Amino acid sequence: MANTASARKRIRQNERRRERNVARMSRMRTFIKKVELAIQAGDKSAAAEAFKVAQPEMQRAAGKGVIAKNTISRKLSRLSARVKALATA
């Protein structure tokens, strides 16, 4: 248990930040899921549109430090490749 006022404050701050980060991760995952569902359905235009909306959301999560920038780069690259493959198929 925290003994000092500053330690109690850090606990409160950490909890607020954790809740914010959980919300950001959930939002990002939702956008990714929309792209993946469009890809599975084979809908080229919906997949491209969903990717266009998901990309800034994913980059925002990386910018806020919720997830590592290289991880987001990798996820975006793979998702983009799948959308492009769908467009050419």
UniProtKB/Swiss-Prot annotation:
GO annotation, biological process: translation
InterPro entries: Ribosomal_bS20, Ribosomal_bS20_sf
GO molecular function list: small ribosomal subunit rRNA binding; structural constituent of ribosome
Superkingdom of origin organism: Bacteria
Chain intervals with Basic and acidic residues compositional bias: 12-22
Alphabetically ordered keywords of this record: Ribonucleoprotein, Ribosomal protein, RNA-binding, rRNA-binding
GO cellular component term, pick one: small ribosomal subunit
Residue spans crossing the bilayer: none
Xref: Gene3D superfamilies: Ribosomal protein S20 (1.20.58.110)
Region spans: Disordered: 1-22
Kinase is among the record's keywords: no
Family: Belongs to the bacterial ribosomal protein bS20 family.
Role description: Binds directly to 16S ribosomal RNA.
Protein name (record): Small ribosomal subunit protein bS20
Naturally occurring in which organism (per UniProt): Gluconobacter oxydans (strain 621H)
